[in-house]
């Protein structure tokens, strides 16, 4: 009986230590992300299969103004634009001449942008964070089969230098950021989108 009590005590101590560590790691990531009010960077994206085969490469520009505003512009190999004003998100494809409108809160659910663009306390509560070496590994506490996990890395200036999205089935999207000094404020309307004439509109709000 005494041995059983000892084993249970060890297990409980281990569990509580893990829970405290996860809470501390979550707070540390939150503080790191809260240090910046904006991001202005070039990005490169590489998508790979679960087996490691490269499926896609792209490059572009990323601008984030916390909370909730961002502009994601793919320049190569095919132009695409995603813009959020904090309420609405526009996804525009010049190639097919179509723009899709979404509620921001729905659109970024389950993506790194929910944390990058300024998550609130209730949104942070949905995620478990574990720091492993220089990486912050983020997983949804609910743990459904559709859930993605994220990895964040920071440079010596405490800027986000890389984030990774790992799909439930193992597909991996890796984004590397090269930060640029913002020499002047973004022009008014930078985080708005004016729909071009003749473009097909898919409003899903």
Swiss-Prot record:
Any Gene Ontology biological process: lipoprotein transport
Keyword terms, alphabetized: Chaperone, Periplasm, Protein transport, Signal, Transport
SUPFAM superfamilies named among the record's database cross-references: Prokaryotic lipoproteins and lipoprotein localization factors
Leader sequence segment: 1-22
InterPro entries, sorted: LolA/LolB/LppX (IPR029046), OM_lipoprot_carrier_LolA-like (IPR004564), OM_lipoprot_carrier_LolA_Pbac (IPR018323)
Principal location listed in the UniProt entry: periplasm
Listed CDD domains: LolA (cd16325)
Gene3D superfamilies per the UniProt record, alphabetical: Lipoprotein localisation LolA/LolB/LppX
Compartment(s) where it occurs, according to its Swiss-Prot or TrEMBL record: Periplasm
Family in the record: Belongs to the LolA family.
Assembly notes: Monomer.
UniProt-recorded name of the protein: Outer-membrane lipoprotein carrier protein
């Amino acid at each position: 009986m005494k041995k059983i009590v000892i084993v249970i005590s060890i297990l409980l101590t281990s569990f509580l230590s893990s829970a405290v560590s996860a809470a501390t790691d979550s707070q540390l990531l939150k503080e790191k992300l809260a240090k910046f009010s904006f991001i202005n960077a070039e990005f490169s994206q590489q998508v790979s299969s679960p087996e490691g085969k490269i499926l896609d490469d792209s490059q572009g520009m990323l601008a984030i103004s916390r909370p909730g505003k961002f502009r994601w512009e793919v320049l190569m190999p095919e132009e695409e634009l995603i813009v959020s004003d904090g309420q609405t998100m526009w996804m525009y494809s010049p190639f097919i001449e179509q723009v899709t409108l979404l509620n921001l809160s729905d659109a970024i659910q389950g993506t790194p942008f929910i944390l990058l663009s300024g998550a609130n306390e209730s949104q942070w509560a949905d995620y478990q964070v574990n720091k492993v070496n220089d990486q912050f590994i983020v997983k949804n506490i609910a743990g459904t089969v559709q859930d993605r996990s994220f990895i964040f890395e920071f440079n010596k200036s405490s800027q986000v230098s890389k984030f990774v999205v790992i799909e439930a089935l193992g597909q991996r999207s890796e984004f590397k950021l090269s930060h640029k000094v913002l020499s002047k404020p973004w022009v008014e309307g930078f985080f708005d989108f004016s729909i071009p004439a003749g473009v097909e509109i898919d409003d899903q709000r």
